[in-house]
Amino acid sequence: MNNFSQENNLNKKNLLKLLIEKSYKKGNFILASGKESAHYLNCKPVSLNGKGLQLISNLFLELMDPSSKAVAGLTLGADPLVSGVILTAASKGLLLDALIIRKETKEYGTKAGLEGPTLKEETVVTVLEDVVTTAGSAIKAIKKLRENNFIVKEVLSIVDRKEGGYEALKEHNIQLKSLFSIEDFLMNNVQN
């Protein structure tokens, strides 16, 4: 359990309400991991909402390892997250950079796999994710960052589905910190 400031404890409650309202569905779904699930979480309706992104960004910023100098994530789910966190950090006088990791390296121009400012080697970067199931997307992001000589210690996610992602990241010496787990949605007797 994460210990947040009093303000962010309220932010967390408000974020859960928004996620339940806009992001959570019951039914039969195939997830990005290929797994079948009776529960679907698409955080984009919340991360692409001004209030939702503000709540996520404040919580992530408080949760993030203070040694991190940048945030990064795999496009598309992480795009609003990295932007929101660096903007929130700047509003508090903290300077962070953001990197967006392409799913496929560009085949033209600079053939970049990462988009963003040029950072020094061994910069500590925190990976941001919306939902972690098996951590496949996060591991892809971590590998790309490590190939570029960055240090990754942690992944922050909005939701951990508790389907092996934590353990998979641990095998890569990465800590997973999540705002919520799937149990938070199940315990709230969501009727969607």
Swiss-Prot record:
Its cofactor is Mg(2+). Gene3D superfamilies: 3.40.50.2020. The keyword Glycosyltransferase applies. 5-phospho-alpha-D-ribose 1-diphosphate binds at R102, K103, K106, E129, D130, V131, V132, T133, T134, A135, G136, S137. Pathway: Pyrimidine metabolism; UMP biosynthesis via de novo pathway; UMP from orotate: step 1/2. GO terms for biological process: 'de novo' UMP biosynthetic process; pyrimidine nucleobase biosynthetic process. It catalyses: orotidine 5'-phosphate + diphosphate = orotate + 5-phospho-alpha-D-ribose 1-diphosphate. It is an enzyme of class 2 (transferase). Keywords: Glycosyltransferase, Magnesium, Pyrimidine biosynthesis, Transferase. InterPro entries: OPRT, Or_phspho_trans_dom, PRibTrfase_dom, PRTase-like. Orotate binds at T133, R161. It comes from the Bacteria. GO terms for molecular function: magnesium ion binding; orotate phosphoribosyltransferase activity. Its EC number is 2.4.2.10. HAMAP family: PyrE. Homodimer. NCBIfam families: pyrE (TIGR00336). Belongs to the purine/pyrimidine phosphoribosyltransferase family. PyrE subfamily. Catalyzes the transfer of a ribosyl phosphate group from 5-phosphoribose 1-diphosphate to orotate, leading to the formation of orotidine monophosphate (OMP). This is Orotate phosphoribosyltransferase. It comes from Prochlorococcus marinus (strain MIT 9515). The lineage of its organism: Bacteria, Bacillati, Cyanobacteriota, Cyanophyceae, Synechococcales. The gene is pyrE.
